[in-house]
């Protein structure tokens, strides 16, 4: 999963189309096919009481991002499988909860990503730093377009650096 953080969760995915397609399950028919997945990002999920007892307590540290991947790790360790079933439909307004607070949501994403890399992938600081620099450059580019990114830059740096220091 360390490899995926760089190859598929950054713009490097453009150079690895086969791996990217497989990672995101694009070889499946999302409208008709039930298939096993590692995690479903941005999902509404259901599990049995037995499964809930096996995978709880949930990690409360990440906020808005990475929770599904952490749950996937817990499910795998406990011997449970995660499946995508197209017959299960939940209407979710993507981005409505974060649309008005883009810089805040981005900051939460980066802090949760650093935490996930450190605690669950056991990445060393020299693995995390390039990813952090990449995300920070993207933050800088977003400042050009979005006023809230300009306004929130101090908070982004303070929170992300605090999370990053915990990796050292």
Segments (PLM) and residue ranges:
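Non-catalytic, C-terminal membrane-associated alpha-helical segments of glycosyltransferases
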Residues: 104-112, 122-168
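Nucleotide-sugar-dependent glycosyltransferase catalytic core
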Residues: 91-111
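Flexible, glycine- and charge-enriched loops at secondary-structure boundaries
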Residues: 62-65, 99-106, 150
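Residues that scaffold the ATP/ADP-binding catalytic core of kinase and kinase-like folds
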Residues: 54-55, 93, 116
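Short, flexible, basic/aromatic active-site loop/helix in glycosyltransferases
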Residues: 2-37
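Conserved short hydrophobic patches within well-ordered secondary structure
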Residues: 19, 63-64, 140-143
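A short, conserved alpha-helix in the catalytic core of glycosyltransferases
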Residues: 30-33, 38-57, 61-89
């Amino acid at each position: 999963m360390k490899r995926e953080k760089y190859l598929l969760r950054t713009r490097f995915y453009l150079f690895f189309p086969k791996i990217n397609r497989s990672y995101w399950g694009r070889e499946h028919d999302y409208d008709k096919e039930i298939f096993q997945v590692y995690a479903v990002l941005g999902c509404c999920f259901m599990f049995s009481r037995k499964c809930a007892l096996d995978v709880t307590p949930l990690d409360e540290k990440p906020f808005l991002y990475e929770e599904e991947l952490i749950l996937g790790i817990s499910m795998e360790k406990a011997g449970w499988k995660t499946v995508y079933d197209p017959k299960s439909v939940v209407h979710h307004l993507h981005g409505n909860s974060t649309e008005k607070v883009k810089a805040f949501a981005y900051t939460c994403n980066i802090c949760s990503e650093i935490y996930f890399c450190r605690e669950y992938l056991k990445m060393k600081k020299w693995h995390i730093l390039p990813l952090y620099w990449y995300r920070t450059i993207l933050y800088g580019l977003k400042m050009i377009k979005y006023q809230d990114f300009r306004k929130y830059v101090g908070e982004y740096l303070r929170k992300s650096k605090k999370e990053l220091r915990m990796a050292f």
